[in-house]
């Protein structure tokens, strides 16, 4: 395992004497993988409604991005709001948090899961967040399913040509290994959000209604001195991510 993950597991193993942690540092139950207190039942339901056993299994890992998202944001509600000032200087306050929100991407195909969604349920703003923790340590080649070339699977026929042009341009420049799975997920989420913005689909039973909508990636930046190898891979992914939008 990479050094950063090993450090996390060492800390978790300190709790091995308790019945909720296995010898390998993973939790027996994802509901125990929280920084403090107990996981609220409504959030447990959100995780169980995600991708079933696969998601629950991954959420037992101490380096789970999904649980990192939960631990960072679960406290947000109408009494405890989060205000963010964005790069465009706009200040938005969020008073609701949702986890593992399903977003339709291709018609009849598996939906994408958005790790975290922040909302202001009074004024209508949305912030979609894809949580990354240590995923960028994984290397591989860029590959999208052939389904993305099938015009009949898109909610609007003209989507197919637009997205395949983007996919082809990335495929042509992705000869080196890197965390390309992150770019693949980015494309899936952007297709899904485009479907919603064009009112082809609903998200959480809601149709887009001209609200302020934003999408960000949350990535943990390792300490350069303590985790040099991981930091280098983080900077590699940062360059790769920004090149996607060039």
State what each model feature region is:
Residues 61-69, 109, 178-188:
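Phosphate/oxyanion-binding active-site loops and adjacent basic polyanion-contact surfaces
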Residues 93-122:
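Active-site metal-binding core of divalent-cation-utilizing nuclease and nuclease-like domains
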